[in-house]
Structure formats: C-alpha cells, structure tokens
Amino acid sequence: MAAYEAIANRPGAYRVVLEERAEGVYVNVFADTSSNAPYIDILQSDLAMAKRACRQDYGIEEHQWRRIADVDWHAPEPRE
C-alpha cells in the first residue's frame, strides 16, 4: 500500500501522513516535530476523500503531498 506525507505546520497538526489500507485511508496527524506517532487517526473511504478532508481541516493543497515509504501504524496483525 502507499503512504503520503505533507507538512501542515499548524498548532496541533505539524505533519499529516495518509496511510492506504484495504479498509480505506487513515489520516494520521502528528502534533509537532518531536511526535513519533500520530495522536489522531481518522479513517476515510479513499485517497481523494482523505486529501479533501486534509485540505479542509489543515489547509494542505495537492502539491504539498509527497509519496513516502509505507508506514505500519495500521498494518494487519500477523497471522499465526
């Protein structure tokens, strides 16, 4: 799956990472530059909806997104 990152640089939302998964796209919000994990994660139905929500909520424009290595905050649990 793919992941995308943008710097919002707003109070309480320094960075946003979109994480594509089978169930949809997680919008992971990081509070500041020292945050190691998101403090908010909102599930959107698809990438377009996630980007629209980020534009509305955090002012992130399409050109600000960059593809990054896949992240695993919501990776499926390994099967035993």
Q: Model-found features: residue ranges?
A:
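Short aromatic-glycine-(Arg/Gly/Cys) micro-motifs in beta-strand/loop hairpins
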Residues: 12-38
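Intrinsically disordered, low-complexity boundary segments flanking structured domains
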Residues: 2-5, 28-29, 51-52
